[in-house]
Each structure stands twice: as C-alpha cells, then as structure tokens.
Design a protein with these regions (language model features):
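Register position in tetratricopeptide repeats
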Residues: 44-45, 78-79, 112-113, 145-146, ...
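Terminal, low-structured helical/coil segments at or just beyond the last alpha-helical repeat
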Residues: 23-24, 178-254
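Residue-level recognition of tetratricopeptide repeat
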Residues: 40, 74, 108, 141-142, ...
Length: 254
C-alpha cells in the first residue's frame, strides 16, 4: 500500500511539473517558494497529508492556480477526504465544465458521501459525454442501489451494445475476499439483479448465465444463479417445505 501511495503521489508531482512547464498555470510557481519546497519534499517521501497542507498554503498565498488546485482534488481523493475533494472538484469543474476527470471525481465523492441521487445525475452526464463502459457500470450500480430498476435496465441495454475488450476488468468483494472479473460480466450481473427485482426472473437468470459464460469463476453471478435455482427447486416441493416466494438472490452487487 505504501509503495502504491508513493507511486501515485509521484505521478501527481510529475503531472504538476509538466503542466507548470507548459505554461498552464495562472499563477507562476516559484521553485524557491517555501510551501512548494515542503510540497516537493512531502511528495518524494510519500507524505500525502503534508503535501495537501503545503498546497493549501501555497494556493491561499498565491491565489488561483489551476495546476495546484487540480492537484488538491487528486490528493484529497487519494486520502479519502471526500468532502474536501468535492469542494475543489466542484469549484474547478465550474471553470472547466468539459473536464471529465473532475466530473468523475465529483460523482465518486457524492457516492462516498451517501448522496446517490446527486451522484447518478453526475454519472448520467458523464456517460452521455464519454460513452465509457466503466462510467455506465458505476451508473448502473448507483441506479440499482436506490431501486431505480427500469433506469438500471435501460443503462444496461445501452452499454451492452458497445464493444468490450478483454482488458476491461473490475474488482468485487465476496465477504472478506476480493475477486476480479470482466467488466462486461459485472454489467450482466447488475442487469440480472435489476431484472430479478422487476419480477422478470427468466430474463434475470439468462443474464447471470451470460456473466458466467464470460467468467465461470465470477462468484457474485454464481451465487445469484445458484440462489435462483434453489428457489425454483423449492417451488416444486410440498408447501410446508417451500422457502419464502419473495426470497431474493443470495448475493446482491451494491
């Protein structure tokens, strides 16, 4: 984790340096500025919190500076400080409405801050602009999470027309364990869950099966399909042995 954090902050430092050299700053950065010296030192040591403090001082002293304000957005995201990240992402996106990275970080922050409706609005806008299948997947997650099921199915139908490459993958949690599968399989699984909750169970089963055709080890889809089969098997038994007819799939992807 420490190596990843250092790598991420070094990447940010290089991005800032390149942007500054290309003349994109609105307030020129001085290499001798004490706040930037602390920032650079913090970056090299992987000390993200100190880097954030240094940049806040620098931006406060120097006024608007596009490069370092954008960097604050990324650093706050790295720290998981979603209130602060949203503040800067929202501020910057008002000045740069076509910056999809800022828009995406706004949506992520809103999701983390338990504001799913607002996050959905952001990801709807983002997906309409980018047609990025990862943005569609996140939108489906959010829509399913607050039971906007018809919208979730509609998003699934739209994104499934796109071309998916084998390198499009995603991670997921099963209890304490983490798995990895194809992004398309994950989309099929959420699509199946939405169909199940809409009482379109035959179609839901087909989507879980489609996910498993892509990845037979995908545990979420496997558990959902097994739960459906168990419910179907129970429906044919004497009434005393029947499970609850409204029982949902065993595993839901939130």
């Amino acid at each position: 984790m420490m190596k990843k954090a250092i790598a991420a902050i070094l990447y940010l430092f290089m991005a800032v340096t390149v942007s500054a050299q290309s003349g994109k700053t609105t307030a020129p950065a001085s290499k001798n500025n004490p706040h930037l010296k602390v920032f650079n030192q913090s970056v090299m040591s992987g000390d993200v919190p100190s880097a954030v403090v240094a940049l806040n001082y620098y931006v406060s002293d120097q006024g608007a500076n596009t490069v370092y304000e954008d960097t604050l957005v990324m650093l706050y995201m790295q720290l998981g400080s979603y209130v602060q990240c949203y503040y800067w992402a929202d501020k910057r996106s008002k000045l740069r409405p076509n910056d999809n990275n800022l828009l995406e970080m706004k949506g992520i922050c809103l999701d983390k801050l338990q504001q799913p409706k607002e996050a959905i609005a952001v990801f709807e806008q983002l997906y309409s602009k980018t047609q990025n299948s990862y943005h569609a997947y996140k939108l489906m997650e959010l829509q399913y999470g607050i039971k906007r099921l018809a919208e979730c199915v509609a998003t699934g139908m739209a994104v499934e027309k796109q071309t998916f490459k084998p390198e499009y993958t995603m991670t997921y949690n099963v209890g304490e364990q983490m798995g990895r599968t194809y992004l398309q399989a994950g989309i099929f699984n959420i699509h199946g869950l939405a169909l199940y909750d809409l009482d379109r169970k035959a179609e839901a089963k087909q989507y879980f099966e489609k996910a498993l055709v892509l990845d037979s080890t995908f545990m979420l889809a496997k558990q959902n399909l097994e739960a459906m089969k168990a419910i179907e098997a129970g429906a044919g038994k004497p009434k005393a042995n029947n499970p609850s007819p409204g029982a949902p799939p065993a595993n839901k992807q939130d």
